[in-house]
A protein has these predicted regions:
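Negatively charged
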Residues: 26-179
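Sec/Tat signal peptide C-region and signal peptidase I cleavage site
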Residues: 21-25
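Bacterial N-terminal signal peptides
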Residues: 10-19
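Positively charged n-region of N-terminal signal peptides that target proteins for export
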Residues: 1-6
């Protein structure tokens, strides 16, 4: 009888764990929204966490070496916002996220960008020549292997704090600060 109770208890515990595991293991999805006022030639990219609603000017996060869809707005974006809902999103690639966003002057809420699982930051801010400040002190770069061209062409930056950058796994960082 004791053996039967132990088996029953084990099966119940296993079933409870199986039901709880997916709830804890689920990743928060992220998406990007482009907003351009009708009266303005320039607009804002906002990063959100959660399921992507239906509509226009919405983009999924890129993976690997795929260019992000929002690059089509690179010439017209003056502001990027990371909404607080994006804090639970874990992108694996920031490849080309703001490459050649030469009109970009402001990034708001960058502390809501969790980079703990990012492996590629190649050309992330490349060509953002109008940015004068950039706070990347909260970036977790422990898993990053590619940083080449990350700040290339960011000629307007007055200072940047990289003191928390962990470059132990970085294999490529050529032209990281060129230009």
């Amino acid at each position: 009888m004791t053996k039967k109770r132990n088996i029953t208890a084990f099966m119940i515990a296993t079933m409870i764990m199986l039901f709880l595991l997916p709830a804890n293991a689920q990743e928060t999805k992220g998406y990007v929204h482009w907003y351009e006022p009708e009266s303005e030639p320039f607009g804002t990219l906002t990063f959100y966490g959660g399921d992507m609603p239906s509509g226009t000017s919405l983009y999924e996060l890129n993976t690997g070496k795929n260019n992000p869809g929002w690059l089509e707005h690179m010439s017209y974006c003056t502001k990027v916002v990371f909404d607080v809902s994006f804090k639970d999103v874990r992108p694996t690639s920031c490849y080309n996220w703001f490459n050649e966003f030469y009109q970009l002057t402001e990034i708001e809420g960058i502390e809501n960008l969790n980079t703990s699982e990012v492996t590629d930051m190649e050309s992330m801010f490349k060509g953002c020549s109008k940015l004068t400040s950039l706070d990347v002190s909260n970036f977790n770069t422990a898993n990053v292997t590619k940083m080449d061209g990350m700040f290339q062409g960011c000629s307007g930056l007055n200072s940047i704090d990289l003191s928390n950058f962990n470059t132990d796994k970085v294999e490529r960082m050529g032209d990281m600060f060129n230009g």
